Amino acid sequence: VFSPRAQFSLKPEWEKDILFRVSGGYYYQPPFYRELRDKTGTVQPNVKAQSSLHLVLGSDYSFKLWDRPFKMVAEAYYKSLTDVNPYTLENVRIRYAANNNATAFAQGLDLRLNGEFVPGTESWFSFSYLKTKENTDNRGDIARPTDQRFKFAILFQDYMPNIPSVKIYLNLVYNTGLPGGSPSYADPYVYQSRLRDYRRADAGFTYVLTEKNASRREGHWLKKFKEFSFGFEIFNMFNNQNAITNTWVRDVYTKNQYGIPNYLTTRVFNLKLSVRL
């Protein structure tokens, strides 16, 4: 296969520090062995490479706010996919149709702002929008297994004003729900439910013992360390139940199948020690 791609960058001679990027191309993805097996387990050697025509527009904007450095990165993209080999997802098992009988598209936007909201610490905010659908045998568009509409995340770092050796961070994540998948080899057009939205908050506290190493006398036991710190973290601090996939269970009486969510880890407490010589 031949996959021509190109990228162009433009940096105008403006007072503002902005870089524009344009990239695109035609990409082929040859099938692997698993993508050649149909629902009976038979290998279909005539499955073709899936292809994608994509276009990406981006910009990097560096600026100063409160006399501190910040950067805003933005990207918008569109992909048109042909000869798609559709697949279904059950729990962690991916089943391919072994047939290039679908077309698809993906479009989205990624935004990220990072900088020193607090002097000497890096924080960032990010937002993503994604829409990806596929059309199998001209039956109409349905959501692809990766169709997660919105993603929003914040990582904010700070330190205690009177004790700068004590650093804290807060990580917040909110994602809209993914498609819930479908039983193996079932018609995905029948199973178009979604998982619950993903919500998570993490917090961490770190005490850096080597913060004042430059002013310490020679021979002090901490002088031999470039970094020596210990901390305490709480992951998923509000104990949210976040599902990642469904396991499908059949009712023997009605013959219906029901999705049982597979949940990720709930609240976790973590102690950490970091040493660098």
Q: In which residue ranges do the predicted regions lie?
A:
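Gram-negative outer-membrane beta-barrel transporters
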Residues: 78-80, 99-182
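Signature of Gram-negative outer-membrane beta-barrel scaffolds
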Residues: 1-17
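Residues that define the transmembrane beta-barrel architecture of outer-membrane proteins
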Residues: 2, 51-55, 78, 103-107, ...
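Short loop/turn motifs that connect adjacent beta-strands in outer-membrane beta-barrel proteins
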Residues: 12-19, 64-70, 119-120, 160-166, ...
